[in-house]
């Protein structure tokens, strides 16, 4: 990874960095893994870029002195592709004055604007044709230039959508609201929670291309992981939750967010 980033920097300028996390023993999973999976990676990266923690990475090419102007982070999965200009469009949408996020007095919930945006996600043309299973279940792959904006119940009626793990977020607001909000080893599917805390918006006119499970077995494995994660966030339907420190606090999520959690289960 370090060599690849060096090669890219030689070709395009010094704009690429590579980080690799240490694996630590997780007694719940009985294996060595990155702390708190993707959620932990984002939290560690956020706190490191903001100067709140020292370098937590095993390999790291970031010059932290050059990172003080970072405002937004685009997060993707390994099988997600940014389409042409989609990154710039996401930044433009986040920077719009009407989308500026405002946090409540306790500092644990975005109450207006948006600190997170979720683009529309489609299945790549190649991904949709890589096996008989994907040809049957993945639907039409690629983009449709005649259908740029789609309707969404939550976005159209409540000015917020559902986060599915690919999008852009405000670095400082994400850290302020979520750094100490979720207890370790309790949540597998964190996307819906993060979207609820940060008041995620759906930008349906901006599209990313995603992969699709190539077989029924991989599809069921992913579905099992999703369902397991959905049940793990049921405590957020109550009036109180436990934060990262194990302290009981008032659940800041509003009724709409709780309905999203409930509807995901049923």
Language-model segment annotations:
Residues 1-254, 258:
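Internal catalytic domains of large membrane-associated glycosyltransferases
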């Amino acid at each position: 990874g370090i060599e690849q980033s060096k090669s890219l920097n030689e070709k395009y300028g010094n704009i690429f960095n590579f980080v690799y996390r240490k694996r630590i023993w997780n007694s719940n999973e009985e294996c060595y893994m990155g702390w708190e999976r993707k959620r932990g990676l984002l939290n560690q990266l956020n706190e490191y870029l903001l100067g709140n923690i020292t370098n937590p990475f095993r390999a790291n090419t970031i010059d932290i002195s050059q990172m003080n102007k970072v405002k937004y982070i685009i997060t993707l999965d390994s099988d997600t592709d940014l389409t042409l200009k989609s990154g710039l469009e996401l930044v433009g949408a986040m920077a719009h004055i009407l989308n500026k996020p405002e946090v409540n007095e306790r500092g644990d919930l975005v109450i207006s604007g948006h600190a997170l945006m979720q683009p529309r996600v489609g299945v790549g043309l190649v991904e949709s044709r890589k096996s008989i299973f994907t040809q049957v279940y993945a639907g039409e792959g690629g983009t449709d230039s005649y259908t740029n904006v789609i309707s969404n119940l939550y976005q159209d009626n409540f000015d917020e959508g559902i986060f599915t793990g690919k999008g852009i977020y405000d670095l400082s607001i994400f850290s302020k609201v979520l750094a100490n909000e979720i207890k370790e080893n309790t949540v597998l599917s964190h996307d819906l929670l993060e979207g609820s805390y940060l008041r995620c918006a759906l930008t349906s006119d901006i599209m990313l291309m995603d992969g699709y499970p190539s077989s029924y077995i991989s599809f069921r494995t992913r579905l099992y992981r999703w369902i397991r994660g959905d049940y793990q966030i049921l405590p957020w339907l109550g009036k109180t939750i436990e934060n990262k420190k194990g302290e009981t606090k008032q659940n800041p999520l509003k009724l709409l967010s709780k309905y999203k959690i409930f509807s995901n289960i049923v």
